[in-house]
């Protein structure tokens, strides 16, 4: 029996689409189409004049999107960091009523051994979101130094055993090249103890390598900055993150644009000094809060456990 790698349960589905506050004639962006769970719900709430622009850099996601036959829907393959260029091409800068980003990796990507994202399935050590370009995890591990690998595991995986893991990978690749996910996972389990029965020892390392290979954090920074320009006044930014590195970027971005700087404590400022502090500082976002999955959703979809949704609204400055 064939395995259905496209089976995917969207996390915080209703909450995310509700946060967008869909207008019947609005123009919306699903910046991480995946398998279209969020897109389909958005389309169900749009009127005949509404539009949904979907983006994904995964060829498999694009193939799935071709199955949506709706004149209000368009899907393109590109990194979401290039979203501003795409919207400029459509002459829609400042016209977007909502942007949805469901960050991280999808269930279909994890479930397909050939993608190389999971330590639970033996497959090629690839890890690229877009399999048509870039360097695979196998190729990078083959050429990276111990210092490079250590930095990646520490910064993108917060892995305490980063140096020992990196040394083991480096020396193993000198003996015989690591080519599969199971080989890499087994090597890591000889170094990292099972301190948490619910968390595989290779979790942090696989996350770190994947983030590095796909330049994920830089992608997030770029798409968030682009959102300010392409959103209409009153437009919503909705972001679902799954680990602290992602959420830290989203939280910082929203707070940066929704809070004025606090004056230094313990120092008396003149009216002019206070005026200078806030000169040319305009709030561009309204922080609308955060939402976590319900206990019921987590029971149905354990993947939702680590999810956190943050949303904001563009202000008229």
Curated annotation (Swiss-Prot):
Record-linked NCBIfam families: 16S rRNA (cytosine(1402)-N(4))-methyltransferase RsmH
Gene (name only): rsmH
Subcellular localization, as worded in the UniProt entry: Cytoplasm
HAMAP family recorded: 16SrRNA_methyltr_H
EC number: 2.1.1.199
Superkingdom field: Bacteria
InterPro entries found in the cross-reference section: RsmH (IPR002903), SAM-dep_MeTrfase_MraW_recog (IPR023397), SAM-dependent_MTases_sf (IPR029063)
Catalytic function, reaction form: cytidine(1402) in 16S rRNA + S-adenosyl-L-methionine = N(4)-methylcytidine(1402) in 16S rRNA + S-adenosyl-L-homocysteine + H(+)
Function noted in UniProt: Specifically methylates the N4 position of cytidine in position 1402 (C1402) of 16S rRNA.
Residues noted as binding S-adenosyl-L-methionine in the record, renumbered to the chain: 36-38, 56, 80, 102, 109
MF terms (GO), sorted A to Z: rRNA (cytosine-N4-)-methyltransferase activity
Keywords from the named record: Cytoplasm, Methyltransferase, rRNA processing, S-adenosyl-L-methionine, Transferase
GO CC list: cytoplasm
Subcellular location, principal: cytoplasm
Any single GO BP term: rRNA base methylation
Name of protein: Ribosomal RNA small subunit methyltransferase H
UniProt family annotation: Belongs to the methyltransferase superfamily. RsmH family.
């Amino acid at each position: 029996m064939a395995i259905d790698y496209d089976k995917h349960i969207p996390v915080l589905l209703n909450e995310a689409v509700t946060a967008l506050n869909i207008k019947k004639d609005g123009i919306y962006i699903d910046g991480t189409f995946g398998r279209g769970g969020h897109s389909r719900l958005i389309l169900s709430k749009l009127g005949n004049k509404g539009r949904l622009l979907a983006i994904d850099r995964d060829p498999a996601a694009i193939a799935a999107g071709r199955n949506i036959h709706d004149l209000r829907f368009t899907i393109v393959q590109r990194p979401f960091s290039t979203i501003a260029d795409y919207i400029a091409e459509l002459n829609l800068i400042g016209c977007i009523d909502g942007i949805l980003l469901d960050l991280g990796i999808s269930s279909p990507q994890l479930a397909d051994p050939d993608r190389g994202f999971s330590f639970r399935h033996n497959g090629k050590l690839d890890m690229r979101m877009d399999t048509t370009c870039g360097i695979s995890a196998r190729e990078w591990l083959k050429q990276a130094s111990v210092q490079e690998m250590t930095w990646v595991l520490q910064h993108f995986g917060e892995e305490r055993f980063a140096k020992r893991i990196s040394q083991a990978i480096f020396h193993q690749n000198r003996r015989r090249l690591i080519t599969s996910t199971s080989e890499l996972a087994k090597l890591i389990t000889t170094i990292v103890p099972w301190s948490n029965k619910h968390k595989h020892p290779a979790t942090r390392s696989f996350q770190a390598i994947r983030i590095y290979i796909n330049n994920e954090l830089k992608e997030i920074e770029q798409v968030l900055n682009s959102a300010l320009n392409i959103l209409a006044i009153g437009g919503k930014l909705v972001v679902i993150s799954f680990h602290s590195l992602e959420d830290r970027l989203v939280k910082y971005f929203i707070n940066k644009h929704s809070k004025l700087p606090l004056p230094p404590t313990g120092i008396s400022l003149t009216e002019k000094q206070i005026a200078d502090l806030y000169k040319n500082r305009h709030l561009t976002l309204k922080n609308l809060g955060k939402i976590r999955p319900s206990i019921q959703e987590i029971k149905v979809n354990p993947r939702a456990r680590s999810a956190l949704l943050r949303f904001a609204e563009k202000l008229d400055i």
